[in-house]
Structures are given as structure tokens and as C-alpha cells.
Regions:
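HAD-like aspartate-dependent phosphatase fold
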Residues: 2-15, 19-203
Length: 203
């Protein structure tokens, strides 16, 4: 039986818990990234965090000593925006989220609105308001489709776990009887979109 060895040309890796943990560098991560860059390998760093834009995340990683260009960062916000662009180009959305998500949606030509949006999109935010959640519930009840950037129920913080997208999506789902479509990890869609973004493929 002959074994064929294929050369790995593209790497997808998790940011959280693989390269950094609560904004502290995991030992060896900087050497690994440097090695990929030195050998010309394509790579994308993946994160379910939708708060920050890739530029913001690149700056935050640089503070830990990790030099990752913004074009090598793929967030659940980017994956969500690309997914919605394929489903309904130039659509509209009501967003519970921050700059990472709103910027990604604007970049694909989406209009953000509270009036009769095509989608309600729930992402990470450090301040979920009762008013915004209530608005989301009413819009979904009126027919807007329900999308969430990722299913993670909690996220890390220096003080301990805090509620994240999955928990808030569950609250809205309970109130509406509508389950969201989760775009981020572990949905393979996020990985496929990432590979497409750097023009690679999986085998």
C-alpha cells in the first residue's frame, strides 16, 4: 500500500486558546506564526469573537507579541457577513453587536435598520440592552430571519465567564420559538468561507 504525502499549504488555526489565552501569548505561538510567514505558507487565524474588526484584533495580538496581519484574521462576523451576502445581496439587518459585526455587514453592502429588516443578527457585545433584545424579539416575531454569529454560551474575561452570543440567542429563541442559524464555529461553513477567502481548499 503506497502512502501519498501531501504538503500542507494553508493553515487554519484558532486564536482563542491556541495562540492567546485572555490576551496572553501561549508559549511557542509567536515562533509558529513567524515560521509560517518565513516559509510563505498561507494561514488564517479564526475567532468566534465578533466584537472586533480584524484590524482591531491584529493590534491586540501585536500587544501580546504576535505579529499577524489583519488580512490573516477571520472572524465569525466576517463569515456571517459573507453568508448573508450570498443569501440576500444588498439586504438589511437589525444588529445586536459591535464594530466587528456592523463593519463587516457594511462592507458587503448591507443596510442596518430597525424597520422591517431581512435579518436579525446577534453577535457579541459587552452591553446587551433589554431594549435591543426586545426589539430583536419583535422583529423576529414579525418575520425577520434569525442569525447568530456563534453558539458560544459564555466568553472569558479576567473576572471569569460572562454571557456570550449563544446565551443571548437562547433567550431570544425562547421568547420567539424561532431557532437561530449559527454561522461561526463549529459550523463547517465558517471554515469553508475562510478557505474561500484565501482561495484555498480542504482535502
Amino acid at each position: 500500500l503506497m502512502t501519498t504525502h501531501r504538503t500542507i499549504e494553508t493553515y487554519l488555526m484558532d486564536m482563542d486558546g491556541v495562540l492567546v489565552h485572555q490576551e496572553r501569548l501561549i508559549p511557542g505561538a509567536d515562533q509558529f506564526i513567524s515560521r509560517l510567514q518565513d516559509t510563505g505558507h498561507r494561514f488564517l487565524v479564526l475567532t468566534n469573537n465578533s466584537i472586533y474588526t480584524p484590524r482591531d484584533l491584529a493590534a491586540r495580538l501585536a500587544l501580546t507579541g504576535l505579529q499577524v496581519p489583519e488580512q490573516s484574521i477571520w472572524t465569525s462576523a466576517l463569515a456571517t457577513a459573507r453568508f448573508l451576502d450570498t443569501q440576500r445581496p444588498q439586504g438589511s439587518a437589525y444588529v445586536l453587536g459591535e464594530a466587528g459585526l456592523t463593519t463587516a455587514l457594511h462592507q458587503v453592502g448591507y443596510v442596518l435598520t430597525e424597520r422591517d429588516p431581512d435579518y436579525v443578527v446577534v453577535g457579541e457585545t459587552r452591553a446587551y440592552s433589554q431594549q435591543a433584545i426586545t426589539r430583536a424579539i419583535r422583529l423576529i416575531a414579525a418575520g425577520a430571519r434569525f442569525i447568530a454569529t456563534n453558539p458560544d454560551p459564555t466568553g472569558p474575561s479576567p473576572a471569569g465567564p460572562q454571557p456570550a452570543t449563544g446565551a443571548v440567542a437562547a433567550l431570544i429563541s425562547k421568547a420567539t420559538g424561532v431557532k437561530p442559524y449559527f454561522v461561526g464555529k463549529p459550523n463547517p461553513l465558517m471554515m469553508r468561507e475562510a478557505l474561500r477567502a484565501i482561495d484555498a481548499h480542504s482535502e
